Amino acid sequence: MITMKIIKTEYDKIKPYITKDGSIIRELLHPNIYKGVKQSLAEAIVPVGSKTLLHKHYTSEEIYYILEGRGLMTLDNEKFEVKKGDTIYIPPKTPHKIENIGNVPLKILCCSYPPYSHEDTEILE
């Protein structure tokens, strides 16, 4: 039998912060907080009428899952609309940003591997 440590977070106890790209982030799981975790999972919120800055991550790949709202995603030279239920894969070194084009906050579940770090992120605009 394999023994494991159960990690459970409580949303209301996680303090949000503003990241380099301008989105409001809640780190749901991150190895800086929970030892043994190998990736990061965060909720990003882009307020109505706002967008993130164009940026890229040198080593991290990201997966975005749209929880709520509508957005205009820029991924390298492509632009396309996203909505609740959509999933977007973002390879390392790929310039990307997202704009809230809806009338409610755009909520995104972001999974990163290796885990998100400010040092791995370059703002491009």
From Swiss-Prot:
CDD domains: cupin_MJ1618
Domain spans labelled Cupin type-2: 45-110
InterPro entries membership: Cupin_2, PKS_Associated_Protein, RmlC-like_jellyroll, RmlC_Cupin_sf
Record-linked Gene3D superfamilies: Jelly Rolls
One Pfam family linked to the record: Cupin_2
PANTHER family: 16.7 KDA PROTEIN IN WHIE LOCUS, CUPIN 2 CONSERVED BARREL DOMAIN-CONTAINING PROTEIN
Name assigned to this protein: Uncharacterized protein MJ1618
Biological source species: Methanocaldococcus jannaschii (strain ATCC 43067 / DSM 2661 / JAL-1 / JCM 10045 / NBRC 100440) (Methanococcus jannaschii)
